[in-house]
């Protein structure tokens, strides 16, 4: 006996996948930034130096005196001479009052008053350097600085994000198929 035969014919299913990849685009605009630096305030004050040279005493030693000094000295000398003259006159008067004592007061007074007085010439032709007085006050510098902070203004911008989601498209390119045929054996004529 012959058994029928099964003939199976199958076609595999085919799936087509079409993918669109996801797209992500990010852009970061730069922030707007303004920086302003105000100038610092600077104040400078200078007190100038002072040099004082006093050579009055050196000139006086050379007998080059100021007119006011000469007037003062002449007045002082006149006062001293008047006082000496008064003292001399009083002394001579006292001598004349005592004329009865031995001596000749009139002749001795005449001799004394007729004597030449010696005049002293200045001996210093060059003054000493110590007579020149020098005084120096150094200058002073005062610097005041007031710093100023920078003014910063920043305006950030949000990022620009463009997102396109991906997509998968599924297509059946070929559907599966299964055909089963039964094949009966052919009977042989010999029977």
Curated annotation (Swiss-Prot):
<dbReference type="Pfam" id="PF20074">
    <property type="entry name" value="DUF6470"/>
</dbReference>
<dbReference type="InterPro" id="IPR045527">
    <property type="entry name" value="DUF6470"/>
</dbReference>
<protein>
    <recommendedName>
        <fullName>Uncharacterized protein YviE</fullName>
    </recommendedName>
</protein>
